[in-house]
Every structure is written in structure tokens, then in C-alpha cells.
Amino acid sequence: EWLSLREPADRAARDATLLARAAQVAGPEPVVLDLGCGTGSTLRTLGGHLPDTARWHLVDNDPALLERAATEAPGRATVHALDLRDLDALPLEGVTLVTASALLDLMPTEWIAALAARLAGAGLPFYAALSYDGIMRWEPELPRDVDITSAFNDHQRGDKGLGPALGPDAATMAARIFRDAGFDVH
């Protein structure tokens, strides 16, 4: 199960300063909406920085992943099987922080702009982590590494169901989009 296999590397890759900032802006009684929650990696990672009373809204389109994620916060997690095409369906009432991990690089520019507008309109902070940036380092380096990276980046830019994804350009584009929507981007 690749989500479990990658979680230790994902956890190590998260910026500790941004995690602390996300926990702070979530407030003393946090209610976190996690988009594309998968098995609950963000809940497990960010949850360690939040009070035990933190409540979670876990959003994914895969009921099996939602069921697994909900076991991480028994009695404090509500699962929502939603299609992320419909951002108006997001349960934002009472939420103090919205999160997304390893998601923005799978989304098109228009979706990220719509998300930024929706969250700005609701006055909600956003913590995004683990967006692929197109850089790979190989050991040992081999002559075809550049070709493999290029092919992977092309695949990342493919349509994942909502239009052509930003892939390796997601972090830069999302930062610009959220800044333009009035967010402080760190």
C-alpha cells in the first residue's frame, strides 16, 4: 500500500515551521477540513501539534480511505465522501483551518483559483504541503535520469479528471494564486 510506504518520507519532508504556523492559526479549538485526506496522513502529522480536542472533517472521494482515516480520530472525525469538483459542497461551517497534502500538483489552475476564492471568501487559512516541484535527484546519477524526470513531469501535468494538472508547477502557481486572493503565503 503505497500511501503507508510513503508516509515516513512525507512526514520528514514537511516543514516544521509551517506545521507550527498551521497549528497556531487553527486556534485553541481547532476544526480542520482536510481535502483529499487519503488514509489520514495530515491528521496524524498535524494532529500531534493540535490539542486532543481538535475536530476533523476528512474529505476524499474514496470511501475505503475515508474509513481508514476516520479511525485515527475516533469520535472527533467526520468523513465526507465528496467530489472535489464541487467546492461549494465543502463543509466550511465552523472550520478554523483547511489543509491539503500531496493534492495541489494533481489539480488544474482553475481548481486552485476556485479554492483560493472560496477560502478567501470564508476567511479561512490554508495549509498545503507536499506539492511535487519537478526536481528529482538520483544516486547514482545515470545518463537517462533527465529523460525519466521529464517523462514523469509530463505525466504529472496530465488530466487527473478535472483538467490538465499543474504537476511540478503547482507550488509556484498556487502561491501566486493564493497571494492574489489576499493570503499571506509562507
Task: Locate predicted features.
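Class I SAM-dependent methyltransferase Rossmann-like catalytic core
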Residues: 1-26
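Conserved class I S-adenosyl-L-methionine
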Residues: 29-38
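Class I SAM-dependent methyltransferase SAM/SAH-binding core
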Residues: 43-87
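Short amphipathic alpha-helix with an adjacent loop that forms part of the alpha/beta core around
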Residues: 86-94
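A conserved beta-strand element that flanks and buttresses the S-adenosyl-L-methionine
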Residues: 99
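Short catalytic micro-motifs in class I SAM-dependent methyltransferases
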Residues: 102-103
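A short, conserved alpha-helix within the catalytic core of class I
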Residues: 106-119
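Conserved catalytic/acceptor-binding region of the Class I
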Residues: 124-186
